[in-house]
């Protein structure tokens, strides 16, 4: 039997009260899926840039699972799609994304979902990303696939671009990305790219991530990918 664990990366920077509210909703959601859930922080404190890769690596180190579902703290997805993604990840190496349509819920509907007054599937999304355009919000990988890339690249911090880089890493080292047909829903919070709430360092971190992504776009071998995920340049 395939052992599965959900790893949720999270640390509250104290900036947006909707983020911990979303986390509570997401944990309640996963409680119904009958798989262990591991909440993993990045080892940093205060309002330091959140390092999702560090949180993922810490979680992967602590859990003993054949397949790990790396799922963000603001995402909801049907259990049936998770079960299908786990089976796909266990059957062959490579990244599996357990949805093909990313639905951004409105602030109002997100509040209703958190309050259990409406199901996410009954909401009209603020916008959507179709045909697998969205990468990174939920990643399902086998231990073999994770070992193939070495680890999540901890040079990335803050918001944006790390997800695209890691998709490249998985594809170079483990084969094509696969998707499960179906939706996932994003609970609204202050955005990580754009807005008056972002600090100069928030913007600088995203700019550094964008520059680092180019190294992944130039990488063509598993050896080079593992150099990068280990922190190389």
Question: What is the predicted role of each segment?
Answer:
Residues 3-8, 30, 36-39:
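Hydrophobic targeting segments
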Residues 10-31:
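Short, well-formed alpha-helical segments that are part of the catalytic scaffolds
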Residues 15, 155-233:
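C-terminal catalytic/acceptor-binding lobe
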Residues 38-62:
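Active-site-proximal specificity loops/subdomain of glycosyltransferases
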Residues 52-57, 75, 134-138, 159-167:
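Conserved glycosyltransferase catalytic-site signature
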Residues 63-66, 151:
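Active-site acidic short loop of glycosyltransferases
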Residues 65-76:
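Short beta-strand-to-loop acidic/aromatic patch adjacent to the donor-nucleotide binding site
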Residues 78-154:
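Conserved catalytic core of nucleotide-sugar-dependent glycosyltransferases
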